[in-house]
Amino acid sequence: MTASKILLLIIDGVGDRPCGVLGNKTPLQAAKIPNLDRLATEGICGIMDPIAPGVRGGSDTSHLSLLGYDPHIYYTGRGPLEAAGCGIKMEPGMIGFRANYATIDDDGNVIDRRAGRIPDTTEITAAVKNGVDLSKYGVEIEFSPGTGHRAALALKGKGLSAAVSSNDPKKTGVQPKTIHPDDDSKEAAFTAEVCNEFSRQAAEILKNHPVNLERKARGEFPANVVLIRGAGEMGVYETFEEKHELSGSVVAAAALIAGIGSSVGLERIPVLPTTPLDEQVRLVCRELEKKDFVLFNVKTADEYGHDGKAVEKTKYLEEVDAALLPFFDMPELMIAVCGDHSTPCTIKEHSADPVPLILHGDGTRIDLVTNYDEISCAAGGLCRISGGSLMPILLDLIDKTHKYGA
């Protein structure tokens, strides 16, 4: 029997380096992960450079690569992908931005870049979206809430450019920056002016909004300024189904990953960071009943890597492992398990270390690897591959590859 469906499970930031607090083991080596070890034992393993050796991939560029989209061709910035993930219908040529609500004091200085980690911005985001008027520029806006203090902005109109800076000072105690053009074009100068006007009007709307007045009355930071960054022009993507001849869905709590999936035509299945892992797995299984392919991203390991919390990262990997049991009951499934990049706790940042990879399903050759970790997988039968090779290998394993030559 040959597998016929693909699950691409990306444990965000899974790769690591030896951690002293773990006895010089990586979190994967220290974790008790019997299900992942079983997948490794019954499958074929290797290590993978998500983009290329020595390249520290972002979650955006790496996911594009793993889905078969060369980031050197398709990547136009994080902003439009984040905007798509927040539910904005991004069209080619629209300019997308990442956004954060923050708090400024009476002197205009930023005192909290996350507005006291405000849990929900739906109401104030709607007020900004409906209240900001850029019609004198011939520009329409889309503004959508993300999780917590996050949001996304998109601009639509003629003569726009993504070559603009950010108003985010990236520190407290100073005022938000004025947005400037990043090149000498009239389009960049025009877009910078539009962005500054958006920021000015948004701050006026937020200043006395009831939500913020209530937060101040409770002694909480008001969300009274919008910081935008990561400008990018929405590109043109060949759909995943056209490219790979597979129908597909994306299950990801991270807006960026959901946005990447929806941008290439995968159906977005909404989940929240608070959605339990077993419920996310249930949704993945439901989608696999209807679709040929599911991209399933779990994010928290990456966050613990950025925070330098090796013990917590280890425990989270054990939680992921425990949620995987239902996939063993799907004999038609080809499972690929990997990371989009390494996020070592020792450096609290993405690194270029290759990530461990498992391919499990009927039709795979079985190697001698019995553990899922960075060192064990390096001895596997896949050896070392690039992220751009992953989809072609998976398509071959489910007998969807077209012959090259006669």
Curated annotation (Swiss-Prot):
Enzyme class name: isomerase
UniProt-annotated stretches for the region Disordered: 164-184
UniProt-listed CDD domains: iPGM_like (cd16011)
Signal peptide: none
Keyword Isomerase in record: yes
Keyword presence, Cell inner membrane: no
Catalysed reaction, written as an equation: (2R)-2-phosphoglycerate = (2R)-3-phosphoglycerate
GO biological process, one term: glycolytic process
GO terms assigned for molecular function: metal ion binding; phosphoglycerate mutase activity
Family annotation (PANTHER family): COFACTOR-INDEPENDENT PHOSPHOGLYCERATE MUTASE, METALLOENZYME DOMAIN-CONTAINING PROTEIN
Its biological purpose: Catalyzes the interconversion of 2-phosphoglycerate and 3-phosphoglycerate.
Similarity annotation: Belongs to the BPG-independent phosphoglycerate mutase family. A-PGAM subfamily.
Protein name from the UniProt record: 2,3-bisphosphoglycerate-independent phosphoglycerate mutase
Species of the source: Methanocorpusculum labreanum (strain ATCC 43576 / DSM 4855 / Z)
Lineage of origin: Archaea, Methanobacteriati, Methanobacteriota, Stenosarchaea group, Methanomicrobia
Protein encoded by which gene: apgM
